[in-house]
Amino acid sequence: LSGEASRILFDYSAQAVAMQLEVDGMWENMPIMDRQNGDMMLAVFKTLAHLDPVERQIRQTGEFTAKLEQIEKVCSMESQGTPTGERVLIKFRAKKDPLKSLSDLGCRDITLNSFKKWIGIYQEEGPTITKGLIIVSAPENGGGLSTVWRCALSAADRFMLDFVAFEPDGSNETSVENISIKHYGAESGLEAIPTIEKAVLREPDGFVVPEISDPAILEALCDQILTMDRMAVVSVNANSASEALAKVCALGVSAEKIAEVFSCSLNMRLSRRLCSTCKQPFLPHPQLLQQLGLPQTHVQELYQQYQPNPAEMGEIPPCPQCDGRGFKGRIGLFELLEVNDQIKQAIISQPNPATFHQIAEQSGMVSMRQDGVVQLAQGTTSMQELQRALA
């Protein structure tokens, strides 16, 4: 609870319990636990989550709150029987998320200011844009989509513009101040399209749909943008801004309609931050700086993860700040693909990530690699970590 762990995985076999901890997106093996103590621990977790401790085969989900001093986290638990025993995954989520804005995630002003233009923030130069389709994305499996989604919506003027979100029953992705949530599904007995049609009567300024996958919902949003000058913000899992746009294009709505409503696509990947206490400077080779596009006159040194002297291994205690990992926390790497005539034409004729990315870079988009190189030059991350994050 006191560290940066986001998930813990338990694999129960007949004799023991294997455990893994995810810290800053990387899985670490933990000491093996004997089955007897593991069973007692699991019974406590299931009881706290209001699950059946005796049931070891049927899938169960629940959550509980854990508190350690001033740290309070919501623990979402999922258990499922396996041929050899049981697998249990617990996800940790801070009750009060310290990351409230895109700036908190590491989004630089050049990208943030452009994104704010599309999401309805007043501009000193040019008209304020209050219509269009905005896509927010991040990789799947812990890539940060929920976090960047909330932070992206927080960039909007939610006091001047009225937003309403649509989510399946049981989902609460859009927990953002001043955005009301309308649920639909079997539990509520409501269907998505009638729910949207009813919300339209309120005449909101914008619609919000996380992890969109239903072509009918996307079609309804596009129609609202075209006929009523509304704004729509959706999210998908994707590795790049261009891939996110291609995924939305592949949902089945006519390409001409997507081309007419599309505004921008914001994508984030997460890179681990070097520990500020133990990171080590080194002199980069001039050829490396040239490959990175960094002027040698401005960048004299880069930083890397702490490399202990082999002769001192085991003698020096690990860094108290990062517990010897060399990294502490994560930072977002961003890219923003903005609409232009070439992008519109590509949506209609060649809706694929490679084409979108090529056009965007030719039009001046700051690519995720370029954003990462800035973080590298500032000593925020390492060359090896940047390569891993962009792979």
Give the label of every model feature segment.
Residues 1-391:
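Short, flexible helix-loop junctions that flank or precede catalytic/ligand sites
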